[in-house]
Amino acid sequence: MSELLSVALFLASVLIYAWKAGRNTWWFAATLTVLGLFVILNITLYASDYFTGDGINDAVLYTLTNSLTGAGVGKYILPGIGIALALVAVFGALGWVLRRRRHHPHHVGYSLLALLLALGSVDASPAFRQITELVKSQMRDGDPDFAVYYKEPAKTIPHPKLNLVYIYGESLERTYFDNDAFPNLTPELGALKNEGLDFSHTMQLPGTDYTIAGMVASQCGIPLFAPFEGNASASVSSFFPQNICLGDILKNSGYQNYFVQGANLRFAGKDVFLKSHGFDHLYGAEELKTVVADPSYRNDWGFYDDTVLDEAWKKFEALSRSGQRFSLFTLTVDTHHPDGFISRTCNRKRYDYDGKPNQSFSTVSCSQENIAEFINKIKASPWFKDTVIVVSSDHLAMNNTAWKYLNKQDRNNLFFILRGDKPQQETLAVKRNTMDNGATVLDILGGDNFIGLGRSSLSGQSLSEVFLNVKEKVLAMKPDIIRLWNFPKEIKDFTVDRDKNMIAFSGSHFRLPLLLRVSDKRVEPLPESEYSAPLRFQLADFAPRDNFVWIDRCYKMAQLWAPALALSTDWCVSQGQLGGQQTVQHVDKAQWQGKTAFKDTMIDMERYKGNVDTLKIVDNDIRYKADSFIFNVAGAPEEVKQFSGISRPESWGRWSNAQLGDEVKIEYKAPLPKKFDLVITAKAFGDNANRPIPVRVGNEEQTLVLGHDVSTITLHFNNPTDANTLVIAPPAPVSTNEGNILGHSPRKLGIGMVEIKVVNVES
């Protein structure tokens, strides 16, 4: 209703101004601005829905002030371009329509009416309401009901008897199991769901709507609200350190807690969260690659579900045989948006909807088959009688190729339980949410029936039942939940641990790199993560007077304030204000002690603009003074005009990447010498090793042979044609996720370059 009203008010404003208001520059500008705001808000809502499937939420609010560089972002480039073009077109058309009768005499009354209608359209729009509620949630001091409903459980289970297997299905919401809407999509896992305790109304609340947030909610009974963006949690050293979560209780009760997934454990800080709360045995992409049958069988995120669940079964079997009390948590990944991945061992590789194949539905059908096979192995084992199996989605599906069909249904998260000790078959329609999952499991295991804000759905009352406006209530509690981090409010002295890549201050520890915004009563950490912009881009968003402390590799800040460190990959500390004074200090000790020293200086807006512009220079456009191309830092020597076919800097150098260009091309500003030596320090990847690699300058070609280890080779070139471009053509680029950013499409690697130097040998 609100949406229709806002559109009606918008159209009425346009029509009244265009046909009745007449010509007046001020009224035209004011009306166009407000109507344009309406358009921007609704395009923002549409774009946010595309990424999150949940409108404008906390993640979007963060992204509005930070660049999105995360997993699979390349698949969203075309929609993003489309939205930008649509915005330009709509603004142009809107301006043209409003000025249709610009020669008509100006009428103040109609102009005022049009402006008021435009303001009303903005106020009535769902986008404005969502943003307003989010902004309010940032400004609130908390909610008195938090202290009433937040409860800490006992730290142990009195007489534990059952082992626990907890399966998180990535985005595997209960909606997929509606056989009327999606016939025969989930037959195997759906049949198992119908054998157990099936909770049919598990809603999604703010702060529980992405993987790490869903895990925190289900184990700690609280949403993931933090003094930083949730997926940046990898930078913290402890996770809700004061909370008692399900893993803590299990460990205190004698359980050995295991977690197995196919992706890297560091992503979004899952390793930090789990280690902080009772898990001593963690297996992710790095840990599994030495034990799985086929280490090369991977998707963009890590190992496929069939591989992960095979390893989980091996763990279950070994732990059961040992007689040790245990919990085994596992997380799938094949159903990750936007398209998902299909394991090669499943039979259900294709699912058609509306008469054509649908990739997201296909991955769901495949993944549920893999999960069901894993569960059936447990059920067929002699240890099932001592086991509780839990299957839940981590969150609702985000925008994927099935999303528009899901949205036509009543959407809920998946949560069902299979008890080997006491089979129960029942569908419970009680209103609940993800925070109730851990408390329900704890209740079954013999512990308390509450964790945090979560309540057992078997013997307690969920906040979803208590409050009709539970989403607004949870947002109101956001400041209370953030306070649970016990995060410091000031920084004076700090220590940088060069060997552990950590910074410590006021009792808190963070992984490096890190950017801090410092005010009188608040220290805001801005870590670097897969979903956030590089820290220099985040710093560029600071106001001229904002105090900052920036700990990063020296070369990243050297181009601004310390040219002598332009090639250093050591840690440096910079602090100051972008519009005032800045300092850069080299971390030259294993335990480096620092102090904050913000000077109250005059703000120079020219300096501020220059700093911001320099911070925003993209990596490939950075230039430094050097007599060679050093590949483990961003940019290139001043003599280089441009380059292509080269991946991002890593700690050792850079790979060639045929996804960015079939050949490595380095174009210099001036012709290369008539006669020169080309000194190349590099290594080869995969089948490129021990094969001739063509290297060309003008009409002359030499060959380079590299092994898998780094070596230095000198090639001799004559350049009679004054060519200025060096070309290296790896013969067999290999598509791989080796060293890739989590969730990104595979790179096609050829050679790994450490340094290239041109030595003039003209006599």
UniProtKB/Swiss-Prot annotation:
InterPro entries: Alkaline_phosphatase_core_sf, DUF7024, OpgB, OpgB/LTA_synthase_biosynth, Sulfatase_N. It catalyses: a phosphatidylglycerol + a membrane-derived-oligosaccharide D-glucose = a 1,2-diacyl-sn-glycerol + a membrane-derived-oligosaccharide 6-(glycerophospho)-D-glucose. The keyword Ribosomal protein does not apply. Its EC number is 2.7.8.20. The keyword Membrane applies. Keywords: Cell inner membrane, Cell membrane, Membrane, Transferase, Transmembrane, Transmembrane helix. Pathway: Glycan metabolism; osmoregulated periplasmic glucan (OPG) biosynthesis. GO terms for biological process: glucan biosynthetic process. The chain crosses the membrane at residues 4-19, 26-48, 76-98, 110-132. Its main location: membrane. It is a multi-pass membrane protein. It is found in: Cell inner membrane. One of its GO terms (molecular function) is phosphatidylglycerol-membrane-oligosaccharide glycerophosphotransferase activity. It is an enzyme of class 2 (transferase). GO terms for cellular component: plasma membrane. Transfers a phosphoglycerol residue from phosphatidylglycerol to the membrane-bound nascent glucan backbones. PANTHER family: LIPOTEICHOIC ACID SYNTHASE, PHOSPHOGLYCEROL TRANSFERASE I. NCBIfam families: PRK03776.1. Belongs to the OpgB family. This is Phosphoglycerol transferase I. It comes from Salmonella typhi.
